Structures are given as C-alpha cells and as structure tokens.
Design a protein with these regions (language model features):
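PLP-dependent aminotransferase class I/II
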Residues: 18, 22, 58-249
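Catalytic PLP-binding core of fold-type I/II PLP enzymes
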Residues: 1-24, 58-61
Length: 249
C-alpha cells in the first residue's frame, strides 16, 4: 500500500477471526491492513449459505464499483447518470431510469441464500469457539504422535477462525504414503483431505517455473493432511479420529 498498490485480503477461511499486531485487535474483514477483504460462504465454510460470498471495504469508491459490478454494471443513482437527456424529464429524474455504464456480472445472491447466511452469522462466535475447543482436544491427543505428526496449532496475535485443522505428517518416517493413509482412515469412517495443491502445479497456472522456485509451498504440500473439524463434532468424534490415525500409522 505504501507503493500505491491495492491490497486484497483473502479471508475466505478466516471469518470470525481477529488480528492483533500489538497496536490493537481488529476483526478479520475490518480491512485494517488491506483495501478489501473477500469471504466465502460455500457449504463447507464456517458461515454457509449454499453458495456465495461477500467483500468488505472501507473505501467508498471501491464499494460503489463493486455494487455496480455485482449487478450487470447497473447504476441507479441520478448523480452518476451519463445520458442526462434520457434520465430526466422537465428537470426531474424519470423514476424508471437506470444506466449500464460498464460491463458487470450477475453476482447477486438470492434472498433465500442471504436469509440462510444471516442466520448462520448469528451463530458465528459460538461456532468459532466450539471449533477452538475441538482443536485443543486434537492438540492434546496428537501430542504423543510427534514427531511423525505435527499439527498446525495455536498461533499468537489474535483469534484463529479454525476453518480447517491441518496436520503435517512425515509419511516417509511413518512408512505409509498419504494416499494409503487416507484410504485407511476412510475404512474407519474418517474423512480426510489435502488443502491445497499448490497453484503452480495446476496446468492453468504453469509458466515453466521449476518446483524448486516454490520450496515452501512444496514442503507444506508434501506433508499436509486435513483432519475433520466441524461444529457438529463431539469430543468422542475427535478421539475416534486420532485413534484411527494412530492405528493407521
């Protein structure tokens, strides 16, 4: 931002979290360090509305542009009309008039989706708190599996939203591949996933750069495994996940 660039915050996993940089605590989405923050309300997210999302910003100009672009570029504010001769009659704005001043999109969420999302927002703090409780149980139960299993746990500087619970696993030391471990967990009724495959490995983003150019991403990717974490989990569910993981290793 010091260089005049816009900073867009990817907050898709972070709703309900906070940032504490020592000079005060701010909610994720308050845009204390960014120009805009984007959230996802996909079915597996902490706030789920079927499909959709939201963008927050403190920039009124940016907010106005986004409001127009989400609905076909339509402008209904008289002070922004370009074709004033069509917009007015006898000095008064025609009540039906609107303009499309730029090509936009249909990014409008339905009223039904929004109603679902609003009801989920009312439970956000409770949801984040429960996720944090489940993570603490995970961390305690996984401790004996170190150093083969090292969960990405607590961090300082604010409240983590805990959309995902990721463990770094030394598959070579365990003598099992990630695929075989996931299959073994599935046989025990435990789902697991990999979040995520680095973008530079995707054909759409490959530019000829060697994997060595992204050693951090590859080091994380080769060892990461997401374990179940959702509000409906019980303490016993977490115990079963860890028990199944230990048996598979």
């Amino acid at each position: 931002r010091r260089e005049g660039m816009k900073v867009i915050e990817d907050a898709c996993h972070a709703i309900g979290g906070t940032i504490d940089e020592g000079d005060g605590v701010s909610a994720v989405g308050a845009c204390a360090y960014s120009d805009a923050a984007a959230f996802s309300f996909h079915p597996v997210k902490t706030v789920a509305m079927g499909e959709g999302g939201a963008v927050t910003t403190n920039d009124e100009t940016m907010a106005g542009v986004m409001r127009r672009l989400r609905s076909h570029g339509i402008r209904r504010e008289p002070d922004g009309f370009i074709n004033t001769a069509l917009a007015t009659d006898g000095g008064k704005t025609n009540p039906w008039y609107y303009e499309i001043g730029e090509l936009g999109f249909n990014y409008r969420a339905s009223d039904i989706h929004c109603a679902l999302g609003l009801s989920q927002m009312k439970k956000l703090d409770r949801s984040v708190a429960r996720r944090a409780e489940l993570v603490e149980i995970y961390l305690d139960l996984l401790a004996p599996l170190a150093p083969v299993v090292r969960p990405l746990g607590r961090r300082g500087g604010g409240r983590t939203a805990w959309h995902l619970f990721v463990a770094r696993i030394d598959f070579a030391a365990a003598g099992i591949s990630r695929g075989d471990l996931m299959r073994a967990l599935r046989e025990c009724g435990v789902g697991s996933q990999v979040h995520y495959i680095p973008l530079h490995l995707m054909p759409a983003f490959q530019t000829g750069a060697a994997e060595a150019a992204f050693p951090g991403a590859m080091n994380y990717y080769e060892k990461c495994l997401s374990l179940p974490l959702y509000v409906g989990m019980t303490d016993e569910d977490v115990e079963n996940v860890v028990r199944s993981l230990a048996a598979a290793l």
